[in-house]
């Protein structure tokens, strides 16, 4: 055989082998490039095909893609990372990806500690920069698995060997916290929060009981620097501020409900003090919404897709504060980057009763297309359509049945939707105990929006009802595969 033709014949043979096996998808390198060009690119099917062929790197990347969806089953993602890690013989960074997922999912964090402990013993924790950074990622979630000064030693190695994209601040913060130096830990957490979106949530948790007022003060100190902060950080701060202010609004709602329930009977005109208090509360609500939206609007103006999606959802959820034209213009921006995500926003847009664009049939047609395309949140949207009465009257039983199936498959957003319907849904007998149960599960699985709902119910539910809700939550978590 001519040596010059050997490579060509080899490539032809490989091509025949792929063709013979029926493979027509993208290679892993092509998928990585597609995600580099568009982080929201739909690559799940091609990654699944590669993962099913046993490609460990594809399993890790598939896990990373699914981890960004609220609808993906968290236990399935854990399994992908574990398979990619392959007892330390495969993708070592898959353990870091697993740690990042578990950091956002408290319940899974507790149940997988033993496996992670064993995994740390399956590879040299400081063999090279990649294994060292992986070990430090695990340390962030399970600091108790690193005795003595081991974490500080790994951090020193990381700082010596890291050449690109080095971010030791969050590691330094947790090391200082473990060493009992809270002042140093807070300084490092604040530095981490300026450059790393994960640092924001970690700093918020570090603040403990004073977390809401302390984080608000920190965010306000950063507001003059907003334009120079990474857009991912700006988006995450806006989301956390929205959660904090949402919790405040929930507490104000609970207090108002309690006051109104005590005033049952003949109507009594509110006192000047009550009127002044209600006015102050309304101003507090408005100021909180405006503060969170300033951060979100900055990220939107910089073309950040997750912020554009969040803003569009905010407009759809608050139709009296925005108009249909504003929402459509923003959805058009999303469509230019992610047509499928824009279609999902359109489906929600056409459910809005307050706008003349209301078109439930069009919404249903779009949802049907999304279901046919296996869009992860399509079933959630279908539940929304029934819950809002888009096709007739509100059908909460049908909506709850759809969301229940999604919740059983691991959707955190489905648990949250069920909680909100049981608390304040139309055309259903409200059940605050069930609402508390589902909200706690949602929070356990990383759904931060549930915080406000829980705070509201903490103020209104009797202690016995809360205990019943927590017992039910524990039973459901034992039964569920999440």
What would you call each of these model-derived segments?
Residues 140, 348-354, 368, 375-413, ...:
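Alpha-helical adaptor scaffolds
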Residues 30, 34, 64-68, 95-104, ...:
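Hydrophobic face of amphipathic alpha-helices that form TPR/SEL1-like repeat modules
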Residues 37, 69-71, 105-106, 145, ...:
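Structural motif corresponding to the intra-repeat A-B loop/turn of tetratricopeptide repeats
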């Amino acid at each position: 055989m001519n040596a010059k033709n050997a490579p060509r014949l080899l490539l032809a043979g490989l091509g025949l082998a792929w063709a013979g096996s029926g493979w027509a998808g993208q290679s892993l390198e092509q998928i990585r490039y597609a995600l580099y060009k568009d982080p929201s690119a739909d690559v799940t099917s091609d990654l699944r095909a590669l993962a099913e062929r046993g490609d460990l790197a594809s399993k890790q990347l598939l896990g990373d893609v699914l981890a960004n969806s609220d609808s993906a089953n968290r236990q399935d993602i854990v399994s992908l990372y574990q398979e990619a890690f392959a007892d330390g013989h495969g993708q070592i960074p898959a353990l870091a990806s697993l740690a990042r997922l578990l950091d956002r999912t408290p319940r899974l964090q507790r149940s997988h500690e033993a496996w992670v402990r064993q995994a740390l013993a399956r590879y040299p924790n400081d063999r090279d920069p990649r294994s060292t950074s992986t070990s430090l990622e695990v340390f962030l979630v399970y600091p108790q698995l690193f005795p003595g000064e081991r974490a500080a030693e790994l951090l020193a190695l990381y700082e010596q060997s890291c050449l690109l994209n080095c971010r030791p601040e969050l590691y330094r913060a947790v090391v200082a916290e473990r060493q009992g130096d809270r002042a140093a830990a807070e300084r490092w957490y604040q530095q981490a929060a300026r450059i790393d979106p994960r640092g924001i949530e970690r700093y918020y948790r570090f603040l403990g009981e004073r977390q809401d007022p302390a984080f608000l003060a920190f965010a306000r100190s950063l507001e003059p620097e907003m334009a120079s902060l990474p857009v991912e950080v700006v988006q995450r701060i806006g989301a956390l501020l929205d959660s904090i202010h949402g919790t405040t609004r929930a507490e104000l709602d609970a207090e108002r409900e309690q006051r109104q329930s005590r005033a049952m009977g003949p109507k009594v005109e509110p006192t000047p003090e009550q009127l002044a208090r209600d006015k102050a509360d309304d101003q507090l609500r408005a100021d909180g919404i405006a503060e969170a939206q300033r951060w979100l609007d900055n990220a939107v103006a910089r073309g950040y897709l997750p912020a554009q999606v969040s803003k569009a959802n905010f407009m759809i959820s608050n139709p009296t504060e925005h108009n249909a034209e504003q929402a459509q213009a923003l959805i058009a921006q999303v469509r230019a980057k992610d047509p499928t995500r824009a279609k999902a926003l359109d489906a929600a847009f056409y459910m809005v009763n307050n706008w003349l664009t209301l078109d439930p049939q069009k919404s249903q047609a779009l949802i049907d297309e999304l279901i046919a395309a296996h869009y992860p949140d399509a079933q959630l949207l279908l539940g929304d359509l029934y819950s809002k009465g888009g096709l007739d009257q509100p059908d909460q039983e049908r909506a709850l049945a759809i969301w229940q199936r999604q919740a059983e498959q691991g959707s955190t957003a489905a648990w949250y939707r069920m909680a909100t319907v049981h608390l304040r849904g139309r055309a259903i007998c409200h059940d605050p105990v069930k609402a508390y149960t589902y909200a706690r599960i949602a929070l356990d699985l990383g759904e931060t929006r549930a915080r406000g709902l829980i705070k509201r119910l903490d103020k209104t539910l009797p202690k016995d009802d809360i205990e019943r809700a927590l017992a039910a939550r524990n039973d459901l978590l034992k039964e569920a595969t999440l």
